[in-house]
Amino acid sequence: MAQFQIECVESNTEESRNHYSKFILEPLERGQGTTVGNALRRVLLSNLEGTAVTAVRIAGVSHEFATVPGVREDVLEIIMRMKEVILKSYSSQAQIGRLLVNGPTTITASHFDLPSEVEVIDPTQYVATIAEGGKLEMEFRIERGKGYRTVERGREEATSLDFLQIDSIFMPVRKVNYSVEEVRADGSIPKDRLLLEVWTNGSISPQEALSSAAGILVDLFNPLKDISLEPTDTNSDIPDDPTAQIPIEELQLSVRAYNCLKRAQVNSVADLLDYTQEDLLEIKNFGQKSAEEVVEALQRRLGITLPQERSSKHS
């Protein structure tokens, strides 16, 4: 069997928080384009490790609905800004970042006092605005992880009651699209060409993301090369897909869209990843408006984008 080739045909890394690359993998046996594309897409979106702010402690603040004197944003807005900050940690241990700023000034990520193991991807990323006489003193916990972690799970691991927990999105890959084309060479048997587009948040390049995803898949399937009939310990812990842990209730959909998905046995974000935007319209009583609502909720809350259409399929 001939080995396929991979080529990066387009790349854009000018924006700090939005890196893009387009890859072509060919030639693949017929049917393998969809198999490889779907597997890579799922792993890229769900299984790569990233960095996120998981908790914030602000001086003089005991809950997220408070305000800080002299700061234009309320605490909830500050927390949302911190959730969006793109960082990269080189440590497997949780790290603590700090901020101490007096007004008047506009606070950006460049004001953070970070450990040497942590890098800020975009120093210009906006956090808050402080007026004359105002002051913002803050500590925040930085962790590495995969997928999405809700506040409830994070609270169990909290090290201090003073910290306000944050729903954390660790996924460094924002979006993945793929399509499959049929190619022929000199009248030979038709083959598949896989076109794969990858967008990341800048903490990892699309090339690094693709390499890591391929490594995960290789490690996953490698034991199948030498199948043993000897009984094995079936009680070993198998890590869950982080995306599978997110119920569709977290998307806060309308009652109509929610009920339609439930009737179609779509109970989690992992189930949704098996659908394209075109597939959603085939769900009974699921109209264009509901499909747009689901797509928008996935993008806004988790940074996930469903493909517009099905990949090309050839009989």
Curated annotation (Swiss-Prot):
One of its GO terms (biological process) is DNA-templated transcription. InterPro entries: DNA-dir_RNA_pol_insert, DNA-dir_RNA_pol_RpoA/D/Rpb3, DNA-dir_RpoA, RBP11-like, RNAP_asu_C, RNApol_insert_sf. It catalyses: RNA(n) + a ribonucleoside 5'-triphosphate = RNA(n+1) + diphosphate. Its EC number is 2.7.7.6. Keywords: DNA-directed RNA polymerase, Nucleotidyltransferase, Transcription, Transferase. Residues 1-228 are annotated as: Alpha N-terminal domain (alpha-NTD). Residues 238-315 are annotated as: Alpha C-terminal domain (alpha-CTD). GO terms for molecular function: DNA binding; DNA-directed RNA polymerase activity; protein dimerization activity. GO terms for cellular component: cytoplasm; DNA-directed RNA polymerase complex. In cyanobacteria the RNAP catalytic core is composed of 2 alpha, 1 beta, 1 beta', 1 gamma and 1 omega subunit. When a sigma factor is associated with the core the holoenzyme is formed, which can initiate transcription. The N-terminal domain is essential for RNAP assembly and basal transcription, whereas the C-terminal domain is involved in interaction with transcriptional regulators and with upstream promoter elements. NCBIfam families: PRK05182.2-2 (NF003516), PRK05182.2-5 (NF003519), rpoA (TIGR02027). Belongs to the RNA polymerase alpha chain family. DNA-dependent RNA polymerase catalyzes the transcription of DNA into RNA using the four ribonucleoside triphosphates as substrates. This is DNA-directed RNA polymerase subunit alpha. The gene is rpoA.
